[in-house]
Structure formats: C-alpha cells, structure tokens
C-alpha cells in the first residue's frame, strides 16, 4: 500500500500555537527588515464612544484636559501557521510575517485609541464630579474678622412716670387726695435689691447678710434637722416667731447657743435695722398711693392727670 507521500499528495493543516521563543526572535527580525505601515490620525477611529458628563442643561460643557499620549501596548497574539505535513517549519511562505505584523499593528493601534478615549471620558467625569462638590464649611475654631467696636446698651427699666405719660390707659384709678395710682402694681411694697453671685448659685441680699452675719442660719439648720413633725419647717424659717409651736423651747435653745455664739445677740438689732431700711426704700421707690382711707377717681385717657402735677384740681 502506497503512502500518501509516494503519490505526491500533500495535506495542509492549520495549527494554532503560541509563538515560541525562536518564533518571536524571527518575528522581530522580520519586523525590523520589513517597512511598517504608518497610519495617520484621521484613519484612527475609536472603537467605542466616550461618555460626556455635564452638570446640567444650563451649564456649558467643560473641555477635557489633554493628557499625554500613552505608549502603545502590543498584545500577545496567537499565530496561525499553515503547516505542511511533509515540509519543515522553515519552508513557510515569506508573506505571512508581514500579514501578522499588519494585524498586530492594527490591533495595538485600536487598543491605544480606545484606552485614550476611555481616559479622556474618565477625566471629564471626574471634573464634573469635582465641579458639583459641596462648598467647604468654615472651621468651628475660626473666628470672624468682625470686631465689635460698640458695647451693647444696657436695658434700663423705665420709670413709672414715663410709662404713665406714654400709656395713660394702664393706670386709670387715681387717689382723690394724693393724685397717685391705686392699682395693685403701684401700691405693692418695694423690696430691697438683691443679686446672684458665685456663678448664680448664692443669693446676695440684705436678709442673707443679716442671717449669715449673726449666725442665725446655723440656728435654722439645727431646728430643721431636730424637728420631727411636719410643722418643723415653718418655725425653722422663723425661729423668733411667737405664734409658732414650741416657742419656749426655741428661745431656750437660742439662749444656750448664744453662750457659744455671741453673735446671735446681734440678731434682734440687725433685724430692726433691716426693717427700717425696707421702709425707707419702699417710701422712696413706691409710685402708688399710700393713703389708707381715700376715694378713688376713674380717669379716661386724656383726662387723666399726670402724677407729677400733684393733687387734682
């Protein structure tokens, strides 16, 4: 039986194999010897379109910054070799390396153009996102450059006389003898001024000065803790009251404590001076009527006389 080689029939097969080391060296040699086809920029087209991001329909489109051209990367391609069964690897046609060179160049060129278009679209999208970033907030510790040159004006309580002149409808009940208002606000007794000290924790007033100066606050504390009934809080606030219960025992206890605390003996005269100061302050600062038995006259708007005029005519 004759073999196929004896009859002279040659069978061609297509073998797909990765390029070997010798094949790569020979391919590089063929590339150096043969002239490469150079494509112009007009012939190069992007495979896919690039996305252009905009902030809105009213905002003009920002030009994308130009990026430096990246070096083209050559892809590893599998070489299709038409092999002959009875021929060796060296007897392949000479035109095939040129075709492989052209295919590799076209693939690398298209890949580079697609990469450049993708990078430009990503840069434009980043610019759009940066343009829509929220404004920076000021630092909490940063102080403003504004300098306060004028101090705020202190709110002063207006005198009742001025309020009577501005709005006479508030004080309509006038005393017939002294000509002063007889409403509850004007006839209420005026207390001595007081304030809060030590970060608004301690009350600074004339009453507290008398109690702390004569050690009466210590006596009140003892009566408060020693009382067993519910009425202990009442006479602990007024230890010198004669109308409360346990009056004799309270005075005996205060007399015994005065031997150790002689400042308790100064409490009665200090209390009398406090009442005198209250009376003087109330006499000078109370704007209302002090008459006990007097008739009340009702005034209407313009017919109401001012308190500065004295008695009614």
Swiss-Prot record:
Pfam families: Sprouty. Keywords: Acetylation, Cytoplasm, Developmental protein, Membrane. Residues 177-289 form the SPR domain. GO terms for cellular component: cytosol; Golgi apparatus; membrane; nucleoplasm. Residues 106-125 have a biased composition (Low complexity). The modification N-acetylmethionine is found at residue 1. Residues 43-152 are annotated as: Disordered. Residues 69-79 have a biased composition (Basic and acidic residues). InterPro entries: Sprouty (IPR007875), Sprouty_domain (IPR051192). It comes from the Eukaryota. GO terms for biological process: bud elongation involved in lung branching; epithelial to mesenchymal transition involved in cardiac fibroblast development; ERK1 and ERK2 cascade; establishment of mitotic spindle orientation; metanephros development; negative regulation of cell population proliferation; negative regulation of epithelial to mesenchymal transition; negative regulation of ERK1 and ERK2 cascade. It is a peripheral membrane protein. It is found in: Cytoplasm; Membrane. The keyword Cytoplasm applies. The Cys-rich domain is responsible for the localization of the protein to the membrane ruffles. Belongs to the sprouty family. Inhibits fibroblast growth factor (FGF)-induced retinal lens fiber differentiation, probably by inhibiting FGF-mediated phosphorylation of ERK1/2. Inhibits TGFB-induced epithelial-to-mesenchymal transition in lens epithelial cells. Forms heterodimers with SPRY2. Interacts with TESK1. Interacts with CAV1 (via C-terminus). PANTHER family: PROTEIN SPROUTY HOMOLOG 1 (PTHR12365:SF10), SPROUTY (PTHR12365). This is Protein sprouty homolog 1. It comes from Mus musculus. The gene is Spry1.
